[in-house]
């Protein structure tokens, strides 16, 4: 018998979610950030490429007035895995007040800024 190809539907984003993308030619890093609103805060799901293996990174939400709110941190895997789940984060930033999401090293080097 012949197996039929399986078709999987793209996951549906929750209402009000936005997908933001950016690339930084200086660092070679590109990122895709899904922003999901909650009441008075946001959830972030980040897929980034071009960051050195083993790099310690932090995720920061930036408000329209320039306030910086920590949203998470992680260590980049030693071996890139395109099937790895996105890095998750959250920040107490009103969904409509988000201006950008920044990925930087813990030492402070900005790798990419994704504008909202």
Residue ranges of model-derived segments:
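N-terminal, charged amphipathic alpha-helical interaction modules
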Residues: 1-3
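Folded interaction domains in cell-surface recognition and envelope-stress signaling
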Residues: 5-116
């Amino acid at each position: 018998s012949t197996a039929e190809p399986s078709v999987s539907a793209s996951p549906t984003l929750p209402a009000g979610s936005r997908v933001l993308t950016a690339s930084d030619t200086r660092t070679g890093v590109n990122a895709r950030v899904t922003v999901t609103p909650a009441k008075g805060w946001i959830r972030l799901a980040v897929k980034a490429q071009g960051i050195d293996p083993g790099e310690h990174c932090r995720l920061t939400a930036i408000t329209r007035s320039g306030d910086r709110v920590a949203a998470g941190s992680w260590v980049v895997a030693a071996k890139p895995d395109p099937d790895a789940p996105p890095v998750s984060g959250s920040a107490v930033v009103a969904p409509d007040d988000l201006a950008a999401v920044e990925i930087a090293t813990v030492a402070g080097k900005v790798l990419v800024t994704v504008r909202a």
